[in-house]
């Protein structure tokens, strides 16, 4: 759509996955330092007030990652990876006009880096986030390690998709320059403990995966941006889903969420483990809502990789 980007979208690179193509950014150095914009039109889900929130989240992450120093002799080959991201949706985004991502380098330390990113349209902030990057392997031997076990239903569903035994649903069918299909597919596996009389005990389970494989050139940063994009797919409908009502009629679009979960008015994400392989772009997820009321809902989401390891 004309006007959806500031610059003409580049040709599609066949060596990259559809997800990488969708999430491409362009640097706007002529406007100012650390300013980026979407290279392609972003998806507006049918019936939604604004564009897909996962696109804004993932492009903010990608923009911040562009300002993280690469390993070099000057920093002792340090690798910094995202470990915390606190987000707020301020206004509904418009897919028909470009987004400018303004990154501020708040702090560069030896073990942690801090960035803030504002996504702006027509001079107004539509989304803001604070991100913290942690130096890889900065913990000593005294650190402890634990995580939630992947639910059996999610594990079985993920095993089937890895073997190609289950078809998924197109989640993003928007005009993204990558055929008419979206960059990932997903499927709801069911609701664990759906027999419970208490909605807060019912837990929807799903799996998602990228179409194709993330390219070697995309690396860890592309995997993390892809995870951010996909993790928003089933999240917002959790409250209405556990109540067995239509999301469209539930009026629950202003959901707020605590740390290690996702989406809408406020959200926070703690990334525990990074994605390192093409297979890592296939993940299982489980959502749970401990409370809803006054037109709002509290939702928690957990994500596991194909090996059942907690990602966040």
Features from the language model and the residues they span:
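Terminal targeting signals and extreme-terminal segments of soluble enzymes
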Residues: 2-312
